[in-house]
Design a protein with these regions (language model features):
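Basic/aromatic-rich interaction segments and small domains that mediate binding to polyanionic partners
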Residues: 13-25, 29-56
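SH3-family beta-barrel domains
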Residues: 1-16
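C-terminal structural segments of small proteins and small subunits
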Residues: 55-78
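Residue-level detector of intrinsically disordered, flexible termini
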Residues: 4-7, 31, 69, 76-77
């Protein structure tokens, strides 16, 4: 599986996965990558179950602030 790039500045929790049940698990933490163009279209670039980043509807996720130790552990586990 691909390591999460250090450019992953935000973590999000999946709250909806309609049509993407294979790629996204509800209640799971994912890394979100900055993508201004996607954001303008209501999308978010997320590293999904495949280990690759794809665009998903922004409404599928809520941002989460992780303590530094948790953030480091999540990035290391990816």
């Amino acid at each position: 599986m691909k390591k999460i790039a250090s450019s992953a500045k935000q973590f999000v929790i999946c709250v909806k996965n309609d049509g993407y049940a294979v790629s996204l698990e509800k209640r799971k933490i994912y890394a979100a990558l900055a993508d201004a163009t996607a954001a303008r279209h209501g999308l978010m670039r997320v590293v999904d179950e495949s280990g690759e980043d794809y665009l998903y509807p922004k409404k599928f996720f809520v941002p989460v602030a992780l303590p530094f130790s948790a953030r480091r552990a999540v990035m290391k586990a990816a």
